Amino acid sequence: MLLAFVFMALGGVRADLPPPRPDTASEKSVVWFALDSQVMGPSMTPRQPLVSRMVAGLICAVTGKNTPDAAWCSFIKPGEKVGIKVSSQPGAIGGTHPAVAQAVVEGLVAAGIKASDIIVWDRRQEDLVQAGYDKVPGLNLRWIEKGAGYDPRAIITTTAIGRLVYGDLSFKESQNSLADILGPKAQLSEESHLPIILSRDVDKVINIPSLCDSYFTGVHGALAGMTIGILDNWRRFSKGDGYGDSSLADVYSDQRIVKKVVLTIMDGIVLQYAGGPYPSPGNCEVNGMLLASKDPVAIDATALRLLDEQRMVSRMPKASRDGGHVAEAAAKGLGNNDEKMILMKRVGFGSRGSISSGEAVVPETAPSPLPATRL
């Protein structure tokens, strides 16, 4: 049931919204996916060679290039600094697996990008450690909180208002009582700040969210990961009932974000269908899938449908009920969320592991889905 959908569907001033992208606003978007039933190894650790093969196949498919080196160079040029944004908050099982980030790093280095020009980053060091990134040699890890910090000059303003707390850049410590701080004298703001990593340190971003639900946004995916997942004063977007949907779409459309994110690869090796964006291993299923697209909206729309399917099996409300920001992003021209405007295409591999003829194929008949494995 879990994969049935896949195969059946086979400065302080708000930035102006970018014009609709011609490849997503008026044409169908393509979400490529790679499946491997053997990708998850012992002790819930993905097998690196299989992950690397899947990533190489996806990058060739997305770009239409014949080799991974040529594919990576179509996104990142030598001398550019690239930030690989991961989603480590859901933990070692439900979050972005280090093997996926490592495959991207190795692919970029093989394509001629200096290792010193590549960073792997997220909001908190403790999340990266919990997810196992500190155990992978050669990764240049960076984090925002208690690390690089937020940029006081990179302000994002929206209509959503939130209460500032300790850790937000504009929060001012007070000697008042807790009741005063949380009551009428609470510090309120409609501003958030971009992290210095994004505003100053990197030229391009490869976003690697995981296939994880979110209590706040339905899916903790491409859009949420590059908005709620990186800003301070993010709680103002997560009050429920669609309160922050339009604002989240506005934030992602800011040129300082949307122009830097060149590719989204979603780690669907495991699907976490409840408890997100926090660790919840009991609500995870081995899924054996990676997805990739230039359209972050299409990736998130696909993820919501997969989550809805699994939550239906588990007799839970649909995740899409809290995922209104995806439709808002589509309405603002950031991509496609309509299932009829999204083409699901599978990357195929030859008997020796090479990408099959045509580099990526869509089976004419739906193959049998991988059996979901409950953890």
Predicted regions and their residues:
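Bacterial N-terminal signal peptides
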Residues: 1-9
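Boundary at the C-terminal end of the N-terminal hydrophobic targeting segment
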Residues: 11-15
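Extended, low-polarity segments enriched in aliphatic/aromatic residues
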Residues: 16-78, 89-91, 95-102, 106-375
